[in-house]
Regions:
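Structural signature of hydrophobic alpha-helical transmembrane segments
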Residues: 1-14, 51-70, 126-141, 187-198
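C-terminal ends of transmembrane helices
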Residues: 16-29, 70-89, 144-159, 202-215, ...
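Cytoplasmic-side transmembrane-helix entry/capping segments in multi-pass membrane proteins
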Residues: 31-40, 62-64, 84-96, 159-170, ...
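Transmembrane alpha-helix boundary signature
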Residues: 48-63, 75-84, 101-119
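Transmembrane helix-loop junctions at the membrane interface of multipass transporters and ion channels
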Residues: 53, 106-120, 184-190, 217, ...
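Mobile "lid/hinge" segments at catalytic clefts and subdomain interfaces of large enzymes
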Residues: 211, 225-257, 261-269
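Membrane-interfacial segments at transmembrane helix termini in multi-pass membrane proteins
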Residues: 248-307
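Structured cytosolic domains appended to multi-pass membrane proteins
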Residues: 286-465
Length: 465
């Protein structure tokens, strides 16, 4: 295959990747988007094989690698629960980072195989690209592993605050930059692996002080890192498809991180610095009447059965309890009684971007019933019931009304404007921000304390009587 034709094929795969992103932007076109991505990746792999013209032995290894990787991917995809998607995404990001490190190491030890020079005489530009790719890849690898452990509950989701962490991180970052300069000048293998070690450590230290509920930003941020790592290695290899794909993933992840931060009214830097929710925050919650109106499943069933409009607000509590199917059953029961049902999604609800959308899609909730914050917030005032299931800080009126609150200014779902707010939660404990939710103590709120799935199931049963 000629290089010109290969460049054209890579360009076609890049266009397909762009179409895939566009398709994945809406649930109704997500399957089509996935198909575009699969075709684009197939073209990129086939083009690479035809361009490289590997020997029979190398081809066997390549096919074996594709079979093992594809088989493992298919196995995981079939067995993974939708509630574990955040962990899966973080795990995949770690593999992208690891791949960038391994490819960079291979290029360092066998530069002639990659067309970037000979041992001891690697092109300076290739060394810079390789160094950046391996540094970002190593940070992505360990950062994603920490994110996986936090999301999977194998590590505390609370911020882990080390003394002088900012100074240590800054020193490590400066050290990596200096070592990259030394590597470009000396091509030392020892310096290369020292960059890897420092970057691996930096990845851990950057993520451990970030609280579990900031994970939507972290996941999209690591997604961006993995893209830039791939793009860096793409430049080293002179692979157009890898450069295009890496740039697409890197830029889309960065944009998504910005959107997530905007949804929390926080700067990207404040999230990366971490520590949010590490201590009990103060606010007006100490001065308000703490009387709580607690209800039962039967009370909730009566209110919903006599409502004309119900807006359901899912949050992380729904994901933990795996209550999405029970929620769909409740919605079906309400619609059978001529009750209008809609779902309201906050952009940072859950532990990854689109977490609630994924869970509702698994339960076959119709797409046209699911609305984003800006599209449905004005409708709460006309709703008879807002059924909040484990969405704490994203419904806290203090973010709207209390200038002294740490979350003041964060866009929230105005569930308190509904005639009645039914709030399902295990306890009256604070959310990740460490502050009381003033919604609990409002006259129009009825607390339904207990497991989200069991409570929803009990409401459905009560509606049958």
């Amino acid at each position: 295959m000629s290089e010109n034709f290969a460049a054209f094929a890579y360009l076609v795969s890049g266009v397909l990747f762009i179409m895939a992103l566009r398709g994945l932007s809406h649930p109704t076109t997500s399957r089509q988007g996935n198909l575009y991505g699969m075709i684009g990746m197939g073209i990129a792999i086939l083009t690479t094989l035809l361009l490289a013209r590997p020997s029979f032995g190398s081809l066997v290894l390549i096919v074996l690698g594709i079979a093992l990787g594809g088989g493992a991917g298919a196995f995981i995809a079939r067995r993974i629960a939708m509630t574990s998607m955040p962990q899966l995404v973080a795990g995949f990001h770690s593999l992208v980072g690891l791949a960038a490190v391994l490819v960079a190491a291979a290029a360092l030890y066998a530069p002639h195989a990659f067309g970037i020079g000979e041992p001891g005489q690697i092109h300076g530009q290739a060394l810079v690209e390789m160094s950046l790719g391996v540094a970002i890849g190593a940070i992505t690898f360990t950062g994603s592993i920490i994110a996986f452990l936090k999301l999977d509950g194998r590590m505390s989701g609370k911020p882990i605050m080390l003394p002088m962490r900012h100074a240590v991180n800054a020193a490590l970052l400066i050290g990596v930059v200096v070592l990259i300069g030394i590597l470009v000048g000396t091509e030392s293998h020892f310096i290369f692996w020292l960059i890897v070690v420092l970057s691996l450590l930096l990845g851990v230290l950057l993520i451990i002080p970030i609280g579990g509920a900031d994970m939507p930003v972290v996941v999209s941020m690591l997604n961006s890192y993995s893209g830039w790592a791939a793009a860096g290695i793409g430049f080293t290899l002179g692979n157009l498809a890898l450069i295009i794909t890496g740039a697409l993933v890197g830029s889309s992840g960065a944009i998504l991180s910005y959107i997530m931060c905007k949804g929390m009214n926080r700067s990207f830097i404040s999230v990366i610095l971490g520590g949010f929710g590490g201590e009990q925050a103060a606010g007006q919650a100490d001065d308000i009447d703490r009387t709580v109106k607690q209800g039962s499943a039967e009370d909730a069933a009566y209110l919903m059965a006599n409502a004309s409009k119900v807006i359901i607000v899912p949050g992380y509590g729904m994901a933990v309890a795996q209550a999405q199917h029970a929620l769909r059953e409740l919605a079906d029961k309400l619609k059978a009684n001529d009750v209008e049902v809609k779902y309201a999604i906050h952009p940072v609800a859950g532990r990854m971007p689109g977490h609630m959308n994924v869970l509702l899609a698994e339960a076959n909730v119709p797409y046209d019933e699911v609305f984003e914050l800006e599209d449905i917030n004005s409708e709460f005032a006309q709703a008879d019931v807002a059924y909040v299931i484990g969405a704490n800080d994203v419904t806290n009126p203090a973010a709207r009304d209390d200038p002294s609150s740490p979350i003041y200014g964060m866009p929230i779902l105005d569930v308190d404007k509904a005639k009645t707010c039914l709030f399902v939660k295990r306890s009256l404990g604070s959310g990740y921000a460490g502050i009381d939710n003033t919604l609990f103590y409002k006259d129009g709120t009825m607390m339904l304390l207990g497991d989200a799935k069991k409570m929803t199931d009990d409401i459905v049963k009560a509606m049958d009587h």
